[in-house]
Amino acid sequence: MQYLCTFACMPISLLEHIISQSFVSVKKIEVIVPSEDLQEYIDSFYVFPCCALSDTLAYNDGTPMLAFLPMAEDSVELEYNHVISSFNSGWFSTRSFARMSIRLFGQVPYLLIVRFKPASFCRLLALNARHFNTRPFWNLESVLGDMDALLKDMQQCARAGEKIQLIETYLRGVISAEENSNRLLDEAIHYIRQHKGTLSIDELKSYLGVNYKWLERNFSEAMGMTPKQYSSLQRFINAYTAFLVQKDLAGITAESGYSDTNHFIKDFKKYTGDTPMQYLRTCKIR
């Protein structure tokens, strides 16, 4: 899912743990590898245990994700730009927007999160990436279409593993035999992530052996954003997670490829609503 979440008074970043891959035993977040025949489309499943949540900051790193709540009566409020939308059963998101927040109601035992491969997701479900980047959140029906039977079956299962099996069966039913992956775009996305968004687009073009028009067209069609926008998003998210640990503004600015601290502070305020130091005080990070 790659959401940054702050629970109650203790800051816990799901995205930070996904990036570091050090969270499985520490935070009891379960990672399930998809079946081999679906690994071209699905990155991972995450079972994220949670309790009643107050306001939580939320981000997405440009990766398409579906979040499923355990029961039909479970609900969530998702807020962006002071507009609140309510969803039952779960939601879909693919791109980061500034100042988003999540509120879950009741004692929701866990979230089941499905992270897809960006280069394959929209093509898999015949979706328009540009359209789905016009809003931060969408209901599940917008993405999965007529899925009443799937949701009903999932809500009969208490265990996340059973729900995952149902999701995989559903996706196998929509995969076209003629569906071809875009491995070069997958490689571009991986290379940007590997370098934490700090490499230039010229470096990316040189590595892949493609021109900018190819990059822009393929990123736009698959992800609804330009390669530069995606790279900038990766840079901020990695700088954010590093800053929470190191709390060294000047050091993180330099390591993350920002030209100066003012640019990092501007991005930080854009996404969180606070300056880095204000954010640390608000979250009481020690």
Q: Each predicted region: which residue ranges?
A:
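Short Lys/Arg-enriched helix C-cap and helix-to-coil transition segments
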Residues: 231-232, 281
